[in-house]
Design a protein with these regions (language model features):
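Detector for outer-membrane/organellar transmembrane beta-barrel domains
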Residues: 91-151
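Outer-membrane beta-barrel "beta-signal"
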Residues: 164-173, 179, 192-207
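Residues on the lipid-exposed face of transmembrane beta-strands in outer-membrane beta-barrel proteins
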Residues: 1, 21-27, 61-65, 79, ...
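Surface-exposed loop and membrane-interface regions of Gram-negative outer-membrane beta-barrel proteins
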Residues: 11, 28-92
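Residues that define the transmembrane beta-barrel architecture of outer-membrane proteins
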Residues: 15-19, 55-59, 92-98, 122-128, ...
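Short glycine/proline- and aromatic-enriched beta-strand/turn motifs that initiate or cap beta-hairpins
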Residues: 1-43, 107, 146, 207
Length: 207
């Protein structure tokens, strides 16, 4: 459960709460696969019923492989297919993305995402992100990242996004609070949905 679903600095729920769930499988070899879902809302509240896109749910399917390179570095490569079942006839947002991650020193991660059919537009995009995660007293975890979403081929614009937050686990219960924002180019593409915002999350993990 999240007070809002934010993806790369943009609200995916018109700044409303989101219900989210996932099912994951991981093998000792490093192979993993899973399904992740969330409620979404891409149309403004004042949109006429006949102009609604019908996309109320996002379901992502992913497979990947992760392994250590040495005592300092590890990598993770995956493929994700973002789908939006229920979208009205003639509307198709589904698209694929390849994601590679390189993690070093146990805290720093560089991520590169590439799609050849971004938002089902037939255009390419790249996403670059650098982030870190640190343990704090009282079993808190601090994480922060900054990213650059190259959408020039899609929107003739690209933008920078960043986030910082705290999280803590209480057994099977995970609680988090994060701050998200983008630069002015993000708001040129997505308007107020890409401005600054705080998001609270509450999750349950079942092994």
């Amino acid at each position: 459960l999240a007070s809002e679903y934010v993806f790369r600095g943009q609200s995916q729920t018109q700044e409303d709460p989101a219900f989210q769930a996932s099912v994951d499988y991981a093998h000792a070899s490093g192979f993993y696969a899973g399904i992740w879902g969330s409620s979404v809302d891409f149309t403004a509240e004042d949109t006429l019923p006949e102009d609604e896109d019908g996309a109320d749910v996002e379901i992502d399917y992913y497979v990947g492989f992760a392994s250590d390179i040495n005592d300092t570095f590890s990598y993770d490569v995956s493929g994700v297919y973002y789908t939006y079942p229920g979208a009205n006839d003639g509307i198709d947002y589904d698209y694929p993305e390849l994601i590679g991650k390189l993690t070093g020193w146990g805290w720093a991660t560089f991520t590169l995402g590439y799609s050849w059919d971004t938002f089902n537009s037939g255009e390419t995009s790249f996403y670059y992100n650098f982030g870190g995660e640190w343990g704090l007293p009282w079993e808190l975890t601090l994480d922060s990242s900054i990213g650059y979403y190259d959408l020039d081929s899609v929107f003739d614009e690209s933008y920078v996004d960043w986030q910082i937050g705290l999280s803590r686990s209480f057994g099977f219960l995970d609680v988090g609070a994060h701050y998200y924002d983008t630069n002015s180019d993000g708001e040129l593409i997505y308007g107020d949905l890409a401005d600054s915002r705080f998001v609270l999350t509450l999750g349950f993990t079942i092994d």
